[in-house]
């Protein structure tokens, strides 16, 4: 006979296991993604990966300055880079590196480079360098066009939610633990992919 637990207890058990795995990874110094995304600095957590000799590369090496100077995604090169707060930033030109070195905070992607729509749900996850938006002179990354479209159904509301959860929960947290928590204990306004798609379709119909 299969023993069934109440929903709240099942969630607690799942969360406990997720946190246990995260703690084990920390203790062993393993889990490459966790290590890359959680520098011991004020930038923690960040959407970064290990690549070649660099253990923590922001946005898989995208040139963060190019979004501001060229208005588009441009891949940086490993030969032109800067380290800031324990994170490596790559650039497509020496000129862009110089701009970053002079004023790094100006060019940092918001929410650690994670998908802004995910952060609105308290989930630091995803973020594709080629899907972005510039809002009030700041860089926001999204985990694909569907996420960007969902966010832009109500940019003001969703930006406020993202800023709230980033400030109250995500900033300074361990990305894997925070992600696991909010994948189980979802925020009141949580929407799945299908619900977001319907919301986007309705918004487009209303505009047409």
Q: Where are the model-predicted features located?
A:
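Intrinsically disordered, low-complexity terminal tails and linkers in eukaryotic proteins, enriched
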Residues: 32-85, 105-208
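Absolute N-terminal positional cue centered near the fourth residue
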Residues: 4-5, 18, 37
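Beta-strand cores of secreted/periplasmic/IMS beta-sandwich domains, seen most often
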Residues: 81-99
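Bacterial N-terminal signal peptides
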Residues: 18-30
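N-terminal secretory signal peptides that target proteins for export/translocation
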Residues: 1-14
């Amino acid at each position: 006979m299969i023993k069934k637990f109440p929903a709240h207890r099942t969630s607690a058990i799942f969360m406990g296991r997720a946190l246990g795995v995260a703690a084990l990874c920390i203790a062993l110094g393993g889990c490459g993604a966790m290590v890359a995304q959680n520098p011991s600095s004020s930038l923690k957590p960040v959407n970064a990966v290990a690549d070649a000799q660099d253990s923590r590369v922001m946005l898989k090496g995208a040139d963060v300055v190019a979004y501001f100077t060229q208005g588009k995604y441009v891949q940086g090169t490993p030969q032109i880079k800067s380290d800031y707060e324990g994170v490596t930033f790559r650039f497509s030109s020496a000129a862009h590196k110089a701009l970053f070195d002079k004023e790094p905070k100006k060019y940092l992607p918001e929410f650690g480079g994670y998908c802004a729509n995910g952060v609105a749900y308290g989930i630091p996850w995803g973020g594709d360098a080629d899907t972005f938006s510039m809002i009030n002179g700041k860089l926001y990354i999204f985990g694909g066009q569907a996420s960007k479209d969902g966010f832009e159904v109500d940019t003001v509301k969703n930006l406020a939610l993202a800023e709230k959860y980033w400030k109250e929960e995500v900033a300074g947290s361990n990305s894997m633990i925070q992600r696991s928590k909010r994948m189980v204990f979802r925020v009141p306004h949580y929407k799945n992919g299908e619900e977001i798609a319907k919301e986007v379709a309705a918004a487009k119909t209303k505009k047409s």
